[in-house]
Amino acid sequence: MISLLPSSKSWFEIEKNIKINHHEIEPLLQSLIVMAWMVETRDPYTGGHLWRVAQYCRLLAEALGLEKSEVARIALGGFLHDLGKISVPDATLKKPARLSDQEYESIKNHPEVGARIVVGHPLAALVKSAILHHHERPDGAGYPYGLDDGNLSVDSRIVSICDAFDAMTSTRPYRLGMSLDQALKGIKMNLHTQFDGNFGHIFIEMGQSGRLNHILGHTDLGIPLQTCLTCGPTMVVRRNQKTGDHTYCHNCSAEAVIEKSNNKIEIIPTGLKGSSKALQPNVDFDLIGEFVTTSASALIVQ
């Protein structure tokens, strides 16, 4: 048997050690990642968000000098942090304007919903803190519990920064995404209040040195984020797609053809609309498979 050990034995009152057969870990990881992927497809503006947050988490955890298993565990938490958004109504997710106070309150339920979703899963102990606490703040003004600096896990501190940075640099229906420099300034202005001071400072240094550039504005390594030229949301190009394949806007149903040449990717509108079958969510099993394999090998403690 293999032991998967959470770094902090006091995160929450569940198993301290998880015993899993070697051949079981990858399917268990994949079950969580695919679920998170399907939740993300509900919001046409967030394509690639979970992948980017996971990559930022990995880089920040590495920069902090954490052990390989901890880096993988926190990156996994980054990929799964928004599971609870399955409970958010479509009208709220897709609203082309700022949310009302009531709508924002409904959004604030997603950490607890996400934590309930993973209850009973054999790997829940690895990710529950990232899911439940990624909107908590050092100044105690976060949610859902208003935890203060002395009660925040490493997971929540890292995912909070990475999630906020990606949110700031991503376009929403009511605003364009910030530049890298603007987003780093936003983090700097909120050190010790919204964000951990030490972790945030290191993240800012990473951004200023160009170490985030290959993730920013991408939906996978080497695949720049594409947007619908008709209405604006993200149109995801998967790594196994080639020139001549189609991608679709899940907001207006517009179809576009993919062009790959000279290491560049472009999508060209066809003027057509996707069929109901074409608009079904597609899971990028190549991206997920690579993430799962990397995570599994790092998480295993013999």
Enumerate the predicted regions with their spans:
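Histidine- and acidic-residue-rich, metal-dependent catalytic cores
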Residues: I2-V301
